[in-house]
Regions:
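Basic, glycine/lysine-rich polyanion-binding surfaces/domains
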Residues: 1-176
Length: 176
């Protein structure tokens, strides 16, 4: 996996405060990063995952689930697309199983899979407060598109419905 995770750089209390204010980022440690290229990638992934990915625009992100035949969650996938490549970010422990499953499901679709876990590391941060640093979102770009996954939970996503009152914490979380 790309890079080792350093526990703290100096004072964990100050670092935690900076993270909560949006002026710092944190290395999320080892993650599995799988890319899917090819003209059929969005239709193919749409057919395999729980999320409507067919009309995802370049730069948009989503959260998708890989379910077993009984509907139990096998993988939680943070999904990004840059217009030519779909980027799937998963926990490191699930990378190999997901890659194996996806490879078996290719059939005749025009897609190519690649394990990019060694090439990248994932950082996370909150976007809030006057100290927020939007330049952190430019850490990774592909095909001119920022590779920033935005957590959909603080709001209602397209096609979604709110079943309870709004979540009180308006802390937009991103991963780049």
């Amino acid at each position: 996996m790309a890079g080792e995770v350093k526990g703290s750089f100096a004072n964990p209390l100050i670092e935690q405060r900076q993270l909560a204010e949006g002026s710092a980022a944190v290395n999320l440690g080892p993650r599995g990063i799988i890319t899917v290229t090819g003209p059929d990638r969005l239709d193919w992934l749409h057919s395999l995952l729980s999320q409507n990915l067919k009309n995802l625009q370049p730069g948009q992100s989503a959260e998708a689930l890989l379910l077993d035949p009984n509907g139990h969650i096998e993988q939680v996938i943070h999904f990004l697309d840059d217009g030519e490549t779909s980027w799937l970010i998963v926990e490191a422990e699930g990378r190999e199983a997901l890659l194996k499953f996806l490879t078996k499901m290719v059939f005749r679709m025009k897609v190519e899979l690649s394990d990019r876990s060694e090439d990248f590391t994932v950082i996370g941060r909150l976007i809030r407060g006057e100290n927020a640093k939007p330049e952190l979102d430019q850490a990774a770009n592909s095909n001119g598109v920022s590779l920033t996954w935005v957590d959909p939970w603080p709001g209602v996503v397209t096609g979604g419905v709110r079943y309870s009152r709004a979540w009180p914490a308006k802390w937009p979380w991103t991963e780049t």
